[in-house]
């Protein structure tokens, strides 16, 4: 996924 990675990066 890309959204999952984005979420982890954002948090």
UniProtKB/Swiss-Prot annotation:
Highest taxon above the source species: Eukaryota
**What does its activity-regulation comment describe?**
Binds cyclosporin A (CsA). CsA mediates some of its effects via an inhibitory action on PPIase.
- Which residue ranges does the record assign to the PPIase cyclophilin-type domain? 1-11
Gene Ontology CC annotations of this record: cytoplasm
The record's keywords, sorted A to Z, are: Allergen, Cytoplasm, Isomerase, Rotamase
What EC identifiers does the entry list? 5.2.1.8
Give the location in the cell.
Cytoplasm
First-level EC class: isomerase
Q: Does the keyword Acetylation apply?
A: no
Q: Give GO MF terms, alphabetically.
A: peptidyl-prolyl cis-trans isomerase activity
What is the reaction catalyzed?
[protein]-peptidylproline (omega=180) = [protein]-peptidylproline (omega=0)
The record's function comment reads:
PPIases accelerate the folding of proteins. It catalyzes the cis-trans isomerization of proline imidic peptide bonds in oligopeptides.
Entry's family note: Belongs to the cyclophilin-type PPIase family.
Under what name is this protein listed?
A: Peptidyl-prolyl cis-trans isomerase
Provenance organism: Penicillium glabrum (Penicillium frequentans)
């Amino acid at each position: 996924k890309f959204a999952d990675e984005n979420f982890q990066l954002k948090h």
